[in-house]
Amino acid sequence: MLLKNLTLLEGFKIKIIDFQKYLREYDQTSGLYPKELMQIGEKYHQKEYLSRDELYQLAHLNSTRSSYHVKKNPARRVEKVTEAAYQIYDDFCRLTLYTGLMGIGIPTASAILTALDPERHCVIDTRVWATLYNLNYFDREKENFKADDYLKIIKIVRKMAAETEFTAAEIGYALFAYDVVHREGNLHQH
């Protein structure tokens, strides 16, 4: 396991992994498809909102298990919420708006943000948190996320991206793959 320390502007060291290696590994995982995610993001940028079908497609990329709940939202509500979120720059507020829709949790909301701006955002889930936990960024594992959890993760990921040639989205995919490669036992401990 290759770990390296980087000194950041704030004067503390950040542990990173071999992102290039784990980005190559990502293609072999069950993670979402970045190209499809970016295509949905392009549509979102063009119209400044997502239709219910587009949001379902994005949610299905991220979580096939819970994406069907997206279809329970009134179509106009999805358009209004995604349009309002598009106009806001604050990450916490955007996440809160997205998660007000049925079928959208923080992991899927993070995928929406990533579709819009892969330089600044990454898709988060249990695996990304677990990798950061194993690198000693967090003191416990976690399976359910709130907007504040995303903000904690993205702060670390953006620092990693700033010190490398990778985008925040690529860092997230590499962190996901790292957990796939190194996890012993089940992902979800119930």
Question: In which residue ranges do the predicted regions lie?
Answer:
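Short charge-dense sequence patches
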Residues: 5-9, 27-30, 45-47, 74-83, ...
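Short alpha-helix boundary/capping elements
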Residues: 62-67, 117-121, 179-183
